[in-house]
Amino acid sequence: MTSYEKMIHILHNKDFELLEDWVADDYFFVFESQMWTRDEFLERMKDFFSRSEKASDFMFEEKCLYENEDCMNYTRLERQEDGEMYRVVGMVLKNSDGKIWRSIERITKVEVKNDTN
């Protein structure tokens, strides 16, 4: 299973155990201007899994842009809690054990066009 396939499996199956095993001890996650340690990230993901709907209900057009043994770059559309649609772009760096070591994501609001003609 590639790292991208593993990430998709974790998100779509709410596989917290696999996520916890995959995250390196010295991991941190940067989202826009916020940063979380491994423990903070895992706590947020546990909360997210417990209260979220199926990933396929709010994640669309998921795509791996690039992957090798050191990194993975991906994008997707995601409907946020505010109901707006955003383009998520992320980068994951892996350590020599293949665990995720650093992650960064940014989001950009996407204008959804409604054709009512």
Placement of each model-derived feature along the sequence:
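A short gly/proline-enriched turn/hairpin at secondary-structure junctions
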Residues: 26-37, 50
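Short, well-structured alpha-helical segments
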Residues: 20, 38, 42-46
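Short, well-ordered alpha-helical segments enriched in acidic and aromatic residues
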Residues: 14-30
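Amphipathic alpha-helical repeat scaffolds
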Residues: 5-9
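A beta-strand edge to alpha-helix "cap/lid" segment located at domain peripheries
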Residues: 12, 30, 43-117
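A diffuse structural propensity rather than consistent per-protein peaks
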Residues: 15, 37-38
